[in-house]
Curated annotation (Swiss-Prot):
Its EC number is 4.2.1.20. Keywords: Amino-acid biosynthesis, Aromatic amino acid biosynthesis, Lyase, Pyridoxal phosphate, Tryptophan biosynthesis. Pfam families: PALP. The keyword Thylakoid does not apply. This is Tryptophan synthase beta chain. GO terms for molecular function: tryptophan synthase activity. The modification N6-(pyridoxal phosphate)lysine is found at residue 99. Pathway: Amino-acid biosynthesis; L-tryptophan biosynthesis; L-tryptophan from chorismate: step 5/5. The beta subunit is responsible for the synthesis of L-tryptophan from indole and L-serine. It catalyses: (1S,2R)-1-C-(indol-3-yl)glycerol 3-phosphate + L-serine = D-glyceraldehyde 3-phosphate + L-tryptophan + H2O. InterPro entries: Trp_synth_b_CS, Trp_synth_beta, Trp_synth_beta/beta-like, TrpB-like_PALP, TrpB-like_PALP_sf.
Length: 406
């Protein structure tokens, strides 16, 4: 593909049609279009409303626990013998991941729009837990669609959602993972447009979702930039994050996009290897197409049918990626690379033993890339990585693979 021309700013998108270059847009059923336009209108008003922003900031500080710390991984840095490694500790947020940043923002929007029912999709269950959490906090009923495969491998999060009062609906269609859960949630939304708000968890879906989710998650990069300047007096040389749909990644990347000295890398799920279909590396091994209301890189066959991807990590097990990532790839601003299941598993164990932090399997993919790159960099160079979630939810998966009975 010809390289997309570089814009004056990498931070000015999307355009009024919700496009990032040829990606994004709004490909939705006619019934949903009025709702999408209404949502966009409300979002435009909310982001320019000081009262909305003040409430968001207040809940960020007192409910989520922001700002999350910037942590220097001293032992990992010493072990690898190269660049200084810093983690943005999003796993310390309320509910254990970055997902809550977006959920708080969207539930405030749902309340503003007068919606009385929340629906959400979830893969790893982290977004489901965060959605159920904010629904409980604001007294709204919540239905979470979750692939049957994920229900099985993320039992602790399913229990959490139920404890929080949400109804968890297992989806058996397809491979019973995130894509299928999103399909069901969209069907529900079409049927219940009047009272229902669809709280999308990733930076994908029809416009304005990719922009909205990015803006709510950009608090990660904005804080990290400030914290890095305070800690080191300069910006990092490299920013790394794991990418499934891509909300944690775009959240840390976006504030750095117009800083030319900062190299940015997104890490996709390479699964069992790119030669077969058992991976979720949409950019590395996919092609552009339309899924879930937007045009983006997808895993699809020659007839445009969506393939069933695979990843050890339920949160990266999605056959697409947010449209802004597709555009950032084509412009060359961000490099996207795959990490295999076994590499992520090894990184999971390395971080746990060296730093006393049990990471989720999603950011373990990013840790694996850090482990590859840090030794090749100078000791005066700095890596910033988004540690997007904690690994409590993954101990059963990891225990099973390592042959440790739980």
């Amino acid at each position: 593909m010809n390289e997309t021309p570089k814009p004056n700013s990498f931070r000015s998108g999307p355009d009024e049609d919700g496009r990032f270059g040829i990606y994004g847009g709004r490909f939705v059923a006619e019934t949903l279009m009025p709702l999408i336009l209404d949502l966009q209108d409300e979002w435009n008003k909310a982001k320019n409303d000081p009262a909305f922003q003040a409430e968001l900031k207040h809940l960020g500080a007192h409910y989520i626990g922001r700002p999350s710390p910037l942590y220097f991984a001293e032992r990992l840095t010493a072990e690898l013998g190269g660049a200084k490694i810093y983690f943005k500790r999003e796993e310390l947020n309320h509910t254990g991941s970055h997902k809550i940043n977006n959920c708080i923002g969207q539930i405030l929007l749902a309340k503003r729009m007068g919606k009385t029912r929340i629906i959400a999709e979830t893969g790893a269950g982290q977004h489901g837990v965060a959605s159920a959490t904010v629904a409980a906090r604001f007294g709204l009923p919540c239905v979470v669609y979750m692939g049957a495969t994920d229900v099985e491998r993320q039992a602790p999060n399913v229990f959490r959602m139920k404890l929080l009062g949400a109804e968890v609906k297992p989806v058996t269609a397809g491979s019973g993972t995130l894509k299928d859960a999103m399909n069901e949630a969209l069907r529900d939304w079409v049927t219940n447009v009047e009272d229902t708000y669809y709280l999308i968890g990733t930076a994908a879906g029809p416009h304005p979702y990719p922009e909205m989710v990015r803006d709510f998650q950009s608090v990660i990069g904005t804080e990290a930039k400030e914290q890095m300047l305070a800690a080191e007096g300069r910006l990092p040389d490299l920013v790394i994050a794991a990418v499934g749909g891509g909300s944690n990644a775009i959240g840390i990347f976006h504030p750095f996009l117009d800083d030319p000295t900062v190299k940015i890398v997104g890490v996709e799920a390479g699964g069992k290897g790119l030669q077969g279909d058992e991976h979720c590396a949409s950019i590395t091994a996919g092609s552009p197409g339309v899924l879930h209301g937007n045009r983006t890189y997808l895993l699809q066959d020659g007839d445009g049918q969506i393939k069933e991807g695979h990843s050890i990590s339920a949160g990266l097990d999605y056959p697409g990626i947010g449209p802004e990532h597709s555009w950032l790839n084509d412009t060359g601003r961000v490099d996207y690379v795959p990490i295999m299941d076994h590499e992520a598993l090894e990184a999971f164990q390395t971080l746990t033993r060296l730093e006393g932090i049990i990471p989720a399997l999603e950011p373990s993919h990013a840790i694996a890339e850090v482990i590859k790159r840090a030794p090749k960099m100078g000791k005066d160079e700095i890596i910033l990585m988004n540690l997007s979630g904690r690994g409590d939810k993954d101990i059963f998966t990891v225990g099973k693979i390592l042959g440790m009975g739980l």
